[in-house]
Amino acid sequence: ADGTLGAANSLAATGLEHKMGIHGNSTCVMLFDNAVGELVGAPHQGLRAMFTMMNQARLGVGIQGLGVSDIAYQNALFYAKDRIQGRALSGVKEADKPADPILVHGDVRRMLLSQKSFNEGTRALMGQQALWLDQAEREADPVKAKQASALAALFTPIVKGFVTDQGFKACVDAQQVYGGHGYINEWGMEQFVRDIRIAMIYEGTNGVQALDLVGRKLLADKGATLQVWSEMVKQFIGQHSANEPVSYTHLRAHETKA
């Protein structure tokens, strides 16, 4: 080939979709009438090749679920500390003000603590998943590398499905903290809810993730990888079972700090 351009392929973007969220991402209507397709790789191996990309994308979508959930929490926490309304049931907290911050109210605290615990636990999960992926690629011991790869595969549908399901719920809770303000565009909370909703759908719906987990990942090695994970949990519990319990007073002092 001399590098001369051939005839233009019959492919065109005919319009933009109008979506619920992620408006910064242009989703186009594509027209492929009479387009010529080129085979990439060996015949009948496309699905296998595609899943190399899909598995990476599913982890990225899980990170999206965590990221949007966390910024929604940070905004909700700031608002709950700043917005004053009513008095705490346990007694006046800020006598110099006409009302206490809504942070003192039980249901607001419940929502914020649910978001905080989810975000922190999920961040640890993401770190562990990244470690397994690194070990699968770089671990010198082939047995350990294979085990890390199996654990990463087992948790991929969990990272995608569970994290985005709960991330959406956390964003709804963050919006709820704002009350009526959360429903108004200028406060930004409704955008988090709209933007995170897609994470439960694309790169394989979360129902498909459940099928993948139960139908493929758990049964692929007759539960051997799940047993490895179970032993890891048991070892962790054994190593920390003698730790001094954290007092409720200590928890209350730190539970809603950013």
Task: Label the model's feature ranges.
Residues P245-S247:
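Acidic, proline/serine/threonine- and glycine-rich low-complexity intrinsically disordered segments
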